[in-house]
Amino acid sequence: MNALIPDIDTLKKVVKINSSLPYESIEPYIEDALDIYIKPYIGKSTISKAHEDKGSDLYNKLLRALGPLTLMLESDELGVMFGDAGITVSNVQGQRSPASDTKIAAAKKNLCFRGMQALDRLISYLEENKKDYPNYVIDNIPRFCFIRNAAEFQDLGMVDIDYSILSYRIMFPTIRQLQEHNIREMITDKVYDILKEALSENTETPKQQVLIDYIIRYLANKTAELYTSQKTTEQHVAGRTIEYTPTIRPIYQDPVSYTHL
């Protein structure tokens, strides 16, 4: 039994589900949803703290993310059976018919949207209450980056992401890659180290701040270009059909090919 969602009634608080569904059909996917979608962004310590107080805001916000993501993860397997005859489904006349592929896809998309939006709100809550969750801070100490948070990505980088911390976290590896590869090619190692030290210690001079602002603007817009490029997106999600898409207002469009005209 999972301590966060110990029964179907708990799950029903955040998703629409039939009470007759055996809890054993859902249980394996709860831990998977935690490990895949939630733990990387809030850490094991924060999840353990939610276990301790089921009446806390932390638990309620975590449940609103975990419920939809659990149901999304198991929806493809729910209703099918694995046995000697292979993969089969129940075929009982007079009972409810299986939903069409279109409806299943639409339901999964909505569950993903709800779960990820709830996860974004959960992360925002933790960021706003860091003093109450010191282990969350320890578990999420990032490596040095010129863009330190979602607000800087939007305000200084001039790319609209709805101030989404989750969007920023999703794009963080790409930002770092561009920083370590492109920025280091644009400026000398000495200048890079000086800017890094100044930014880390909040001792930037006005001239240094101008250069840092330009770097942030480049990193934000180049990252957004990569994430909104149709070709990049097609390559990125080829092996994963369910993936959170960062909130970015379109700023880039692949050139249109007219060869087929």
What are the functions of these language-model segments?
Residues 1-22, 141-156:
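Short, intrinsically disordered N-terminal pre-domain segments
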Residues 57-91, 217-228:
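Elongated alpha-helical scaffolds
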Residues 38-63, 72-76, 80, 204, ...:
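N-terminal assembly/attachment segments of tailed bacteriophage virion structural proteins
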Residues 126-165:
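Low-complexity intrinsically disordered segments
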Residues 259-260:
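Conserved small/polar residues in nucleotide/adenosyl-binding loops
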Residues 26-34, 165-203:
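Hydrophobic/aromatic interaction determinants used to assemble and anchor large protein complexes
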Residues 76-93, 229-253:
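Extended intrinsically disordered, low-complexity coil regions enriched in Ser, Thr, Gly, Ala
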Residues 11-47:
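N-terminal ordered "arm"
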